[in-house]
Regions:
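N-terminal (or domain-start) structured segment
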Residues: 17-107, 146-148, 170-197, 288-289, ...
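A ligand-binding cleft/hinge motif common to bilobed small-molecule-binding domains
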Residues: 91-100, 159, 164-168, 195-229
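An extracytoplasmic/periplasmic, membrane-proximal ligand-sensing/linker region
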Residues: 23-25, 167-169, 208, 231-234, ...
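Hinge/capping helix and adjacent helix->loop/strand transition within the periplasmic-binding protein
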Residues: 76-81, 96-183, 232, 245-278
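Beta->alpha turn/N-cap motifs
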Residues: 86-91, 151, 180-181, 197-203, ...
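Bacterial N-terminal signal peptides
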Residues: 3-15
Length: 317
């Protein structure tokens, strides 16, 4: 049989198979604890895809090892489109921060598309004697190593936002990792920890209620959700920028027609007018892009955080 005929038969087989996909439930693995942004938006996506694909799409939370446990499970799953991964900045950070992983992000997983991105909010507990970012930086510099900040775990976007802040502001603030965003948030609200970065959508209500002080947002521009809060760059740390983003990947050998189908359905879901409107109120921006564009985005993000890890000598806590 000639190569051309074989290729044609394989293409026909994939095309027929993908037309019938999915023929059974699809599982979205979220390698983070319940309650964080990845979990919230993963469940949103599951509901939307259940409707559009005509099959149940279920979420399975598999936290552990800084997202390594759940990610490895997906990387080793059958490459048939029935197990996919919600992933984030944590994964691109881990490429440098955790070099001895049981998988290689860019070799063992295939990019599908980006889901959304959000700016973060730098908050401090209300008891601290600082009312703006410059005062907080001055306070931290006056007592190096005494103040601390919470994160949802090593290598998470919240951890990296904190390390980038320390590096650029020139302050010594101790990292206190927690098992998930909910625990980190509770620690700051309970005045057990001084500061944290969190997604605007999940923390803003506590700042409006006076339990926390909002000192700055992490994006290039002020957030529409908190228009009175300056960016960290304009409030005292020029050039600072950090966001949290989410994306979707599948095992590396997943057939391209399946990747394309999932890509199209996700983009359709996140670009719906009602979704855009709802997300805008939460400070989330749709990120729909082609698999190639998302792959390029991932490689660039790996490079960005690799530089910070190397510049600071950062290690997994």
């Amino acid at each position: 049989m000639s190569r051309a005929v074989l290729a044609l038969l394989l293409l026909s087989s994939f095309s027929c198979w993908s037309q019938n996909y999915p023929a059974r439930p699809v599982k979205i693995v979220v390698p983070f604890a319940v309650g964080g942004s990845a979990d919230v938006y993963g469940r949103f996506l599951a509901a939307k895809l259940s409707d559009s694909l005509g099959q149940p799409v279920v979420v399975e939370n598999r936290p552990g090892g800084g997202a390594v446990v759940g990610t490895d499970a997906v990387a080793k799953s059958p490459a048939d489109g029935y197990t996919v991964l919600v992933m984030s900045n944590t994964h691109t950070v881990n490429e440098t921060l955790i070099p001895k992983k049981p998988y290689d992000l860019m070799k063992d997983l295939a990019p599908i598309t980006g889901i959304n991105s959000q700016d973060l909010l730098l908050v401090i507990n209300a008891e601290l004697k600082a009312n703006n970012l410059k005062e907080f930086i001055a306070l931290a510099k006056s007592q190096p190593g005494k103040l601390n900040y919470a994160s949802s775990g090593p290598g998470t976007p919240y951890h990296m936002a904190g390390e980038l802040f320390k590096h650029m502001a020139g302050v010594d603030i101790v990292h206190v990792p927690h098992k998930g965003s909910d625990q980190a948030r509770t620690a700051v609200l309970g005045h057990q920890v001084d500061m944290m970065f969190d997604a605007i959508s999940t923390i803003v209500s506590h700042t409006k209620g006076g339990k926390l002080k909002a000192l700055g947002t992490s994006g290039k521009h002020r957030s529409a959700v908190t228009p009175d809060v300056p960016t960290i760059a304009e409030a005292g740390v020029p050039g600072y920028e950090a966001t949290i983003w989410l994306g979707l990947m599948a095992p590396a050998a997943t057939p391209r027609p399946v990747i394309d189908k999932l890509n199209a359905e996700v983009i359709k879901a996140i670009n719906a007018a009602d979704v855009k409107e709802n997300w805008a109120k939460q400070g989330a921006v749709p990120m729909g892009m082609s698999p190639e564009e998302f792959g390029k985005f991932l490689r660039e993000d790996v490079q960005k955080w690799s530089k910070l890890v190397k510049d600071t000598g950062m290690k997994v806590d």
